[in-house]
Amino acid sequence: MGNCTSHPHHEPQVHFDTVDGMATVKAFAGIRQVTMGVLRIDYEYQTNLGDILDPRSFDFRIISATAEGLTFAKAKAGDKLDATGKELLERAVRQLIDNGADFIVGDCGFLVYWQVMVRDYAQDYAQKKYGRKCPVMMSSLVLALPLLATIPSGGQIGILTASEKSLQAVQKKLPIVIEDHQKEDGGQRSRSVPAAEDPSGIMINFSDPRFKVVGLDEVKDFKHALDAQGADAVNDRRDIAVQIAAYCQKVQEKNPQIAAWLIECTEAGGFAWAIKVGTGLPVWDPITLGRFLSLGFTANVPNVALTLGQHGENPLDPSATTAGKGRCTGEEPGQIHALGAEFQAIREGTL
């Protein structure tokens, strides 16, 4: 690494070549890893790379808990949960938080029906027992509204789902499910916003011309994989990848205004790469959702240490560095920029 000059009032100065590297490694290794909690429906399926439950899909810790009795059929239908169903759902949420979940996502897009319920359970329990917050995003559909800001005027976001008919039904039933929860809860934990106007912070309006709901019902091998499950679920995922990419390309040719794809179905997330390559468009999916939430808990300490001045008050002069990222240009003699006191303590082994 090249050398650069620190501002004279930044003391003490640190020379990386005199630092005990292993002490630093041990300090950073002691930082707790980000943990994602996955709320599962009562449904067994074969996980694959790109699925929300496959540990290879992420570079952080994953734990899961099942909402017993909440089957795929019930989730898809948005059926009202009885007292026992709600108790089992809340139990699963508490289990995730007790096991260290920093945030919670769902393993089925139709869990969006219980976004408000799970969010309220999580925030209430995490705050009362541990004095912390626990963000909840049950479905990648929560990304629909902010993604509208990324597309050009007249453009569309293609929303990929396993069943177009079932997803269209969400728009009608979601406010009802949320209103039932708010009434029974007495408004104690739910935000005081009419569900029909602001359902859990998720603005779902598929009649909006900026959305194009695309069902994967016609992709035979994918449908078979969903219906069969078990050993016969997937003959060759490469065939499914090609079929989905070709189908999306076909839809895109008929709807050239589609500027991006949002995958709602968690089991289709593993084919995001094929859609990106096949259509040439950006793709967001359930994996994107998990990674997005994880960033709120990721301390990018090495970068912070190199780009901030003592106590984080004085950033390096961007004009004296490459790309304004605090990297030394190699032209300045002297010493590396002084680290903040907290990072100095880490290096000296006093923290």
Curated annotation (Swiss-Prot):
Q: Set out the biological process GO terms recorded for this chain's protein.
A: protein homotetramerization
Give the main EC class: lyase
Give the reaction(s) catalysed: S,S-dimethyl-beta-propiothetin = acrylate + dimethyl sulfide + H(+)
Q: What induces it?
A: Highly expressed.
The entry assigns this protein to a family as follows: Belongs to the aspartate/glutamate racemases family. ALMA1 subfamily.
Q: In UniProt terms, what function does this protein have?
A: Mediates cleavage of dimethylsulfoniopropionate (DMSP) into dimethyl sulfide (DMS) and acrylate. DMS is the principal form by which sulfur is transported from oceans to the atmosphere and is a key component of the ocean sulfur cycle. Constitutes by far the most highly expressed Alma gene in CCMP373 strain.
Molecular functions (GO terms): dimethylpropiothetin dethiomethylase activity
Its taxonomic placement starts with: Eukaryota, Haptista, Haptophyta, Prymnesiophyceae, Isochrysidales
UniProt-recorded name of the protein: Dimethylsulfoniopropionate lyase 1
Q: Which UniProt keywords apply?
A: Lyase
Q: What's the subunit arrangement here?
A: Homotetramer.
The active site is formed by C108 (proton donor/acceptor), C265 (proton donor/acceptor)
